[in-house]
């Protein structure tokens, strides 16, 4: 069983903001797998299958900085090893629209990832980093929470579709296949 999480903040106020790129990816993934989210614990959860593999889709509803409070208990309950937990999230250090898939690593400056790493007590889990390309001269908090323009929404929609397909490929064929196909694609 895999757990695929997408990070974001709950509520309409945050819906079309860069910080909710992970939620956008999970919505695209749920659509592709014909799965429906329902409230479970501290998150919105959907069950699906990718090939013969059962997959738990998770959108934490704890707000970004406490994402681990949702993901870690679900992983423990379902006995999912960290290597089978993939997290989709916004990354300010990548150009907008670019994906980078990694097997493990630090959280960098991302507080949601810091929370997950702390609660899982490991950095050893795959992540699908979604480029939001934070520009110079704007406070990071202001940038990640700004409403996306129509042009940005189109880029994010395509990036979310690609992240969803990367997650499917990761489960079906493994991390290396997903990295090879999606880690260098930009929009």
Over which residues does each language-model region extend?
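Nucleotide and nucleotide-moiety/phosphate-recognizing core
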Residues: 2-104, 113-128, 136-139, 146, ...
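Gly/charged, well-structured mid-domain segments that form the phosphate/adenylate-handling core
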Residues: 132
């Amino acid at each position: 069983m895999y757990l695929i999480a997408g990070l974001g903040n709950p509520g309409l106020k945050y819906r079309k903001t860069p910080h909710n790129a992970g939620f956008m990816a999970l919505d695209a993934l749920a659509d592709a797998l014909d799965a429906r989210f329902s409230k479970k614990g501290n998150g919105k959860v959907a069950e699906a299958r990718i090939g013969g593999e059962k997959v738990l889709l998770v959108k934490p509803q704890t707000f970004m900085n406490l994402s681990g409070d949702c993901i870690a208990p679900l992983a423990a309950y379902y006995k999912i090893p960290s290597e089978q937990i993939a997290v989709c999230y916004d990354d300010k250090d990548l150009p907008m629209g670019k994906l980078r898939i990694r097997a493990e690593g630090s959280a960098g400056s991302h507080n949601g990832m810091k929370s997950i790493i702390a609660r899982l007590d490991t950095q050893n889990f795959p992540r699908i980093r979604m480029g939001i390309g934070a520009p110079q001269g704007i406070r990071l908090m202001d940038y990640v929470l700004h409403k996306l323009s129509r042009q940005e929404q189109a880029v994010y929609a395509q990036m979310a579709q690609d992240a969803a397909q990367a997650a499917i490929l990761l489960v079906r064929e493994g991390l290396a296949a997903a990295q090879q196909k999606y880690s260098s694609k930009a929009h």
